[in-house]
């Protein structure tokens, strides 16, 4: 009788059986009782030497962060680390750039670390292929919805970007803004930009607001510098512009500075709204109005879902968490 046999009979993962053997307190009582009953039924006795050798690597989780300049991801990472450490796991963080191959990164991590599971923050769903299922360990994507990928071991937790962007445009319209410019990434390459642009289009169509992509959309790479440049482009090419929606808070802060450098007052001459709800936006002048992604809820739900997959062999799950409107002073 091997540990794999015990896991199969108990209906859980090998990692969960290992945690029971190591007396890890994070295993749920019902799961521990089920595993213990199977071991007693078959008279299973663990190999003490093997247990000692493997114990130090059995509690590992990998956290893969795509993009090193994103303030939202930094906050999310801190809270996610705290969540998994409280459950008895040791996270190892890997930073990858925008051009990195997630599947190659996963193969490297599994070869070097043999983790229980992997979190991805900031990756795009299309980066994952069905080959991910062959690795045999639970994975979870944060900040993007992976339900449409139909990969059996890939879960996701995210905000509904489309609905959030639509809600923001609706609020701007209710305050009298009819010509609204948008700063965002390339919708062809960025899933968040695509979803948020779709939400903007939904609201504008419903409210019968004008929208011309060529004059009312400016490309930027989610940084303050790019937001600064994009805001200037919108002012130059879009007559009648009275409000700007930037698809990240950092771009919004850059946009505000660009407008001020041109002698425009925010919000008296031009309203600016962001997206993410990072801490920095609370301390700018004016204080930033934005859509907040609640990083505490995102981290808690992500940790709970992935650890259920690890400890209880639960199926992949895809959860949408609520977004929040943050009333600042920039609209």
Where are these regions (language model features)?
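Short beta-strand segments enriched in small/hydrophobic residues
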Residues: 14-16, 53-69, 171, 179-186
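Flexible loop/turn connectors
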Residues: 154, 230-331
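Periplasmic-binding protein-like
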Residues: 114-121, 181-184, 217, 238-248, ...
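Hinge/beta->alpha junction and helix N-cap segments in small-molecule ligand-binding domains
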Residues: 65-75, 93-101, 156-167, 183-230, ...
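Alpha-helical recognition/docking segments in bacterial nutrient-uptake
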Residues: 56-170, 236
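N-terminal helix-turn-helix DNA-binding module of bacterial transcription factors
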Residues: 1-58
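Short acidic capping loops at alpha-helix termini that bridge into adjacent secondary structure
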Residues: 178-179, 211-216, 266-269
């Amino acid at each position: 009788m091997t540990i794999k046999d015990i896991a199969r009979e108990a209906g859980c993962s090998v990692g969960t059986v290992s945690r029971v053997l190591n007396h890890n307190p994070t295993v749920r009582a019902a799961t521990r009782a089920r595993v213990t009953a199977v071991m007693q039924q078959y008279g299973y006795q663990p190999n003490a030497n093997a247990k000692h050798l493997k114990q130090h690597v059995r509690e590992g989780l990998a956290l893969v962060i795509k993009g090193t300049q994103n303030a939202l991801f930094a906050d999310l990472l801190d809270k996610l680390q705290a969540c998994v450490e409280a459950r008895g796991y040791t996270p190892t963080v890997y930073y990858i750039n925008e051009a990195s191959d997630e599947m190659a990164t996963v193969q490297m991590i599994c070869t070097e670390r043999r983790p229980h599971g992997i979190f991805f923050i900031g990756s795009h769903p299309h980066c994952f292929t069905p080959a991910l299922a062959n690795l045999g360990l639970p994975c979870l994507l944060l900040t993007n919805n992976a339900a449409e990928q139909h990969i059996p071991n890939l879960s996701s937790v995210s905000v509904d970007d489309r609905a959030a962007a639509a809600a923001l445009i609706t609020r701007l319209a209710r305050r009298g803004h009819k010509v609204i410019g948008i700063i965002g990434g390339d919708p062809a390459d960025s899933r968040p930009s695509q979803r948020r642009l779709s939400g903007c289009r939904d609201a504008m169509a419903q409210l019968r607001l004008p929208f011309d992509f060529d004059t009312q959309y400016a490309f930027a790479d989610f940084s303050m510098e790019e937001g600064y440049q994009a805001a200037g482009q919108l002012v130059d090419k879009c007559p009648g512009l009275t409000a700007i929606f930037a698809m990240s808070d950092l771009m919004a802060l850059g946009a505000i500075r660009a407008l001020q450098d041109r002698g425009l007052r925010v919000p008296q001459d031009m309203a600016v709204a962001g997206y993410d709800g990072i801490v920095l936006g609370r301390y700018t002048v004016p204080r930033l109005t934005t859509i907040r992604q609640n990083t505490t809820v995102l981290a808690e739900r992500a940790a709970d879902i992935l650890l259920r997959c690890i400890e209880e062999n639960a199926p992949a799950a895809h959860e949408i968490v609520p977004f929040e409107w943050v009333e600042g002073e920039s609209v």
